Design a protein with these regions (language model features):
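Cysteine-nucleophile active-site neighborhood
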Residues: 4-85, 156
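Amide-donor transfer/coupling interface in amidating biosynthetic enzymes
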Residues: 64-170
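Short acidic (Asp/Glu) and glycine-rich catalytic loops that position anionic groups and cofactors
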Residues: 1-3, 37, 135-138
Length: 170
């Protein structure tokens, strides 16, 4: 998480960190990112001045900052893909609060959408987030309320444990 738009230049310049995270993802390390972390896992970030900064490129989305709040509110989310926090069909609750938005149409053709979201206040349904092809990387704007779905936290710890065990065998 955090505010990558405030540090986009420094994040882009830290090539060794970008490469290390991308390599860890390719090697199957479980990576779970919410909001700012989701932005960092994407292809690029367009800031308030329309400057474009490359991010890790692990997930297909490109995001742009907006002066107006893009989303705030509680949502229910259903996992659409098996991934590091659970199986397809798992229901989670949480909230979204962000000034950035995915650039429309980018990523949708090649990406594996992570969630089907339902806004609690008006029942609007929309897709969100992405899961990597291997299922080890999950990113979205959703801030999960893990007390409402302990199974997701347990699954993520299990994914991390299994990854650690697999690394010991090498």
């Amino acid at each position: 998480g955090g505010f990558p738009e405030m540090f986009a230049s420094q994040l882009e310049a830290n090539k060794s960190m970008l490469a290390a995270i991308a390599q860890a993802a390719r090697q199957g390390m479980p990576i779970f990112a919410e909001c700012g972390g989701y932005m960092y896992l994407g292809q690029c970030l367009k800031d308030f001045e329309d400057r474009i900064f490359n991010m890790t490129g692990i997930l297909p989305q490109q995001v742009q900052m907006n002066k107006k709040l893009q989303m705030v509110g509680y949502v229910e989310a259903e996992l659409l893909q098996d991934c590091c926090i659970g199986q397809a069909g798992m229901k989670l609750k949480g909230h979204e609060f962000h000034f950035s938005a995915e650039i429309p149409g980018v990523g949708d053709v090649v990406g594996n959408r992570a969630f089907s979201f339902t806004r609690m206040r008006n029942n609007a349904v929309y897709p969100g987030g992405f899961v990597s092809d291997k299922g080890n990387v999950l990113g979205s704007y959703l801030h999960i309320h893990f007390a409402g779905c302990v199974e997701a936290a347990t699954a993520f710890v299990g994914s991390c444990w299994n990854y650690n065990i697999s690394r010991q065998d090498k």
